Amino acid sequence: MQLPFPLAEEPDAAAMETGRKLFAGQSEFLKGVVAMSGLPPADRIEVCFAGRSNVGKSSLINALTGTKGLARASNTPGRTQEINFFTQGPELYLVDLPGYGYANAPLAVVEKWQRLLKQYLSGRQTLRRAFVLIDTRHGVKKVDEEIMKLLDTSAVTFQVVMTKADKVKEKDRAKILDQVRDALSKHPAAYPEIVLTSSEKGDGIATLRSIIAHLD
């Protein structure tokens, strides 16, 4: 019997090549957005990346695009309150949502960002999938549950990407995956497959590229 939320398998050669070609194109930072009025034209499909601060979001985007330093990490949780848009060739926007984990952010800033996030998620017709990044060392935390609930209510399909998988021994990883699967079973918008990655080692990057390349 197959587990609910199985790990994504490595794509076949043709699917992997489609992903490679998409991400072989030029990757560039387009703009940071602080209000809906600043969004770029909805003229191509887009995927967004959400995750708590220090989950490895910038590293993952840099690994996907093969462009070191394209997405820059902030060491202060909640500091960057912009939605950052990157172009991936002429076909795709990669959208970096601000890291959540608000211990050091003023309440007014948090509320403003949450409003913008809700508006973006519910109002962006070209958004094909959200990727929610979960640190393999820690599993799903309360703040992750909050973003998943928001994606449920916004009717945006989201897929969990486990980061830093190389930092966890295989026996411990199985326990964490059980916890993640249990959490995902409560979310109707969760895509029924998990991607295991390590930006440092390159594990799972080709798989994620292929998944993105086959969204339409």
From Swiss-Prot:
InterPro entries: G_ENGB_dom, GTP-bd, GTP-bd_ribosome_bio_YsxC, P-loop_NTPase, Small_GTP-bd. GO terms for cellular component: cytosol. One of its GO terms (molecular function) is GTP binding. Mg(2+) binds at residues 58, 80. Keywords: Cell cycle, Cell division, GTP-binding, Magnesium, Metal-binding, Nucleotide-binding, Septation. Coiled coil: none annotated. The keyword Cell division applies. The keyword GTP-binding applies. Residues 43-216 form the EngB-type G domain. Its cofactor is Mg(2+). GO terms for biological process: division septum assembly. GTP binds at residues 51-58, 78-82, 96-99, 163-166, 197-199. Necessary for normal cell division and for the maintenance of normal septation. Belongs to the TRAFAC class TrmE-Era-EngA-EngB-Septin-like GTPase superfamily. EngB GTPase family. This is Probable GTP-binding protein EngB. The lineage of its organism: Bacteria, Pseudomonadati, Pseudomonadota, Alphaproteobacteria, Rhodobacterales.
